[in-house]
C-alpha cells in the first residue's frame, strides 16, 4: 500500500513533466510544414513591410556600401555588374526568409506554450486527488527534517535565487523563457526583469518568514538568522 501511495504521485509528476512537452512537440512538428506554406502564400506583403520597418537602418548601410562598390566597378564589364545585382537580390531574399522563419517560430512557440498551459491546467483540475497526495507527502518529508536542515535548505535556496551572485543565473533563466516563447532577445527587457524579479522574491520571502515561520516554528527562524549572520 505504501509503495502504491508513493508510485502514483511519482507517475503523476512524470506525466506532468513529459506529457505536455511531447504533445506540444508533436503539435508543432505536425503543423510546421502546413503553417510555413500558408504563411509564404498569404503573408508575403505583410512580411516585406515588416522587414523594411525592422531592418531599414541596417540595410541602408549595407546597400550604401554595395552602391559604393558598384560605382567603383563601373568601368568593369557588364557581366560583373550583373553578378553584383544578382548577389544583392539573393541577399535580400535570404534576409526575407530569415525574418520569415523567425516570425513563424515565434507564433509556433507561443502556440505550443499555450497548449502546455491548458494541459497543465487540465491536469491540476482532473488530478486533484494526486495533488493532495503529493502535498501530504511533501509536508510529511519536510516535517521530519530537523530545524537546522530546514534553515540550511532555506538559506541555500535563497542564496541561489536571490543572492548577490544569482544575477547570471536569472539572466540564463529569463533568457531561456523569453526564447522559449519565440521572442527575439531584448537585453533591456531581460536586464529590467533581472534587476526587479529577485527583489520581489526577496520581499515575499521576508514576509513569509515574518508571518508564517515566526508563528509555526520560532526556533527555525532563530537558527535561520544565526546561520544567515
From Swiss-Prot:
It is a multi-pass membrane protein. InterPro entries: CemA. GO terms for molecular function: antiporter activity; proton transmembrane transporter activity. The keyword Cell cycle does not apply. It catalyses: K(+)(in) + H(+)(out) = K(+)(out) + H(+)(in). The chain crosses the membrane at residues 7-27, 107-127, 154-174, 189-209. The keyword Lipid biosynthesis does not apply. Disulfide bonds: none annotated. It is found in: Plastid, Chloroplast inner membrane. GO terms for cellular component: chloroplast inner membrane. Contributes to K(+)/H(+) antiport activity by supporting proton efflux to control proton extrusion and homeostasis in chloroplasts in a light-dependent manner to modulate photosynthesis. Prevents excessive induction of non-photochemical quenching (NPQ) under continuous-light conditions. Indirectly promotes efficient inorganic carbon uptake into chloroplasts. This is Potassium/proton antiporter CemA. It comes from Glycine max (Soybean).
Amino acid at each position: 500500500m505504501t509503495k502504491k501511495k508513493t508510485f502514483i504521485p511519482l507517475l503523476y509528476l512524470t506525466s506532468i513533466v513529459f506529457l505536455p512537452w511531447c504533445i506540444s512537440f508533436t503539435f508543432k512538428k505536425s503543423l510546421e510544414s502546413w503553417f510555413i506554406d500558408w504563411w509564404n502564400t498569404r503573408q508575403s506583403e505583410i512580411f516585406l513591410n515588416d522587414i523594411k520597418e525592422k531592418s531599414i537602418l541596417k540595410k541602408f548601410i549595407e546597400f550604401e556600401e554595395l552602391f559604393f562598390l558598384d560605382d567603383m566597378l563601373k568601368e568593369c564589364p557588364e557581366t560583373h555588374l550583373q553578378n553584383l545585382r544578382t548577389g544583392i537580390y539573393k541577399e535580400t531574399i535570404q534576409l526575407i526568409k530569415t525574418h520569415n522563419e523567425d516570425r513563424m517560430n515565434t507564433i509556433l512557440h507561443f502556440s505550443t506554450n499555450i497548449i502546455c498551459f491548458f494541459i497543465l491546467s487540465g491536469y491540476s483540475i482532473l488530478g486533484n486527488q494526486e495533488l493532495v497526495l503529493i502535498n501530504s507527502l511533501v509536508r510529511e518529508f519536510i516535517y521530519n527534517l530537523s530545524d537546522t536542515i530546514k534553515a540550511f535548505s532555506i538559506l541555500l535556496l535563497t542564496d541561489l535565487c536571490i543572492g548577490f551572485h544569482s544575477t547570471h543565473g536569472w539572466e540564463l533563466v529569463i533568457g531561456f523563457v523569453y526564447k522559449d516563447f519565440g521572442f527575439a532577445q531584448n537585453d533591456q527587457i531581460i536586464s529590467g526583469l533581472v534587476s526587479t524579479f529577485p527583489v520581489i522574491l526577496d520581499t515575499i520571502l521576508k514576509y513569509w518568514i515574518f508571518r508564517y515561520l515566526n508563528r509555526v516554528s520560532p526556533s527555525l527562524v532563530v537558527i535561520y538568522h544565526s546561520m544567515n549572520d
